[in-house]
Amino acid sequence: MKYRDLRDFLAQLERQGELKRITAPVSTRLEMTEIADRVLRAGGPALLFENARHNDAPADMPVLANLFGTPRRVAWGMGADDVGALRETGELLASLREPEAPKGLRDALAKVSMLKAALWDMSPKTVRSAACQEIVWEGADVDLGRLPIQTCWPGDVAPLLAWGLVITRGPNARRQNLGIYRQQPLGPNKLIMRWLSHRGGALDFRDHAQAHPGKSFPIAVALGADPATILDAVTPVPDTLSEYQFAGLLRGSRTEVVKALGSDLSVPASAEIVLEGHLLPADDPRAVAAAVPEGANPPPATGYEMALEGPYGDHTGYYNEQDWFPVFTVDRITMRRNPIYHSTYTGKPPDEPAVLGVALNEVFVPLLRRQLPEIVDFYLPPEGCSYRLAVVSIRKQYAGHAKRVMFGLWSVLRQFMYTKFIVVVDEDIDPRDWTEVVWAMTTRMDPVRDTVLVENTPIDYLDFASPVSGLGGKMGLDATNKWPGETSREWGTPIHMDEAVKRRVDAMWDTLGL
């Protein structure tokens, strides 16, 4: 699907019957979550709440939910016709990450054409004026309370800004970083920026704090960017390519950006809303001293304004622990005329992150095959919180091969550093079919011999099951047929019906009255 911006994408969804306008008044507090969750679980359309109620009053703008509520809409957002076509997106990413030597003149010309399109033809286009800056709130006019930010779950500490595209740039970075990080409002102009230490935004901030200690760090947050740009932020785009460039490749047109009004950051020109501001040094007059609740650990000594974030209901299906994160002070809010507020919720799968995982699974397969050619297929079950459990089928070639694949998966892409469980099966097993996977595990595994346990590895900070926050164990399960050297016993022979018998029964089937 080709489109210009979010509004064009929504118009096309509506023509396809994939967008439902809701005119009844619906509250941003809990009601939207319940409605969106029921619709997502039924495989229903994206939702545009045209009469949202916020803080017991009519909201200033409509709220968009469930935009990526089905794998097909994710594929459309990435410029593909269907989920299967995302394998081609993965092939493109694999080629851009690690180009192979051309196999001949024709192949060389094709690779030159691809690189030209990626690195030159689709470089972002900077414009002087943009729709995202048609309206500007500054100074005392900045009020996050006027945005219809959802309160998703009864135990949430506050509303939650969940689809903000966070734009940063470190002092040594060749390009900007785009990331999706949740943000907790603290007041009319402050948000807690919850990013994990290994994420691009956090790394940019760390480098800035080391290079320019005591200096404020500029940030922009885009809400309602075009789908390709949003999805790029959760896709393993090569470090040599900007997310804006890759979004252009997916969309089929250059991404238009505009310089932020208060910094040198480039923001999506068609975004519905943009928040501009800084992370402030702790001694800045605008910074607020951290309030430490009784019994809580004090904030880390970063030299910057910090606050205790959470708890919030998360994609794990549980409320997460509180932790300290930097505070984003919003200097101005720019927006389009009649803006749309893009929102979501996270909860026990399936939710939008789980649906994204199903679609992005197809992108990952070619990337993994480039590093591990023996991989036949790869599956991240959505019930596993999108990334915590993986099942991979391989063409086994030697004893111990499954263990090599386990450690390869944990190392190849940053997306899998938090995968706790990896199940490796042979190519005759469909990793997407639990009946086959369980059969392989129960017939081809010895629990002692074929289980790999690794201690003290990086783990998602939201994983309260780990003994230490951010550090825990991993398990690999080798459910492949065992080769000489892995067993001293004669291995079982699978049962298969004779093909000639199957053909004879096929021929007589219609006469059997079954």
Curated annotation (Swiss-Prot):
Prenylated FMN binds at I180, Y181, R182, R194, W195, L196, R199, G200. Mn(2+) binds at N177, E243. The active site is at D314 (proton donor). NCBIfam families: UbiD family decarboxylase (TIGR00148). The gene is ubiD. Belongs to the UbiD family. This is 3-octaprenyl-4-hydroxybenzoate carboxy-lyase. It is a peripheral membrane protein. Catalyzes the decarboxylation of 3-octaprenyl-4-hydroxy benzoate to 2-octaprenylphenol, an intermediate step in ubiquinone biosynthesis. Its cofactor is prenylated FMN; Mn(2+). Keywords: Cell membrane, Decarboxylase, Flavoprotein, FMN, Lyase, Manganese, Membrane, Metal-binding, Ubiquinone biosynthesis. InterPro entries: UbiD, UbiD-like_C, UbiD-like_N, UbiD_bacteria, UbiD_Rift_dom. Its main location: membrane. It is an enzyme of class 4 (lyase). GO terms for cellular component: cytosol; plasma membrane. GO terms for biological process: ubiquinone biosynthetic process.
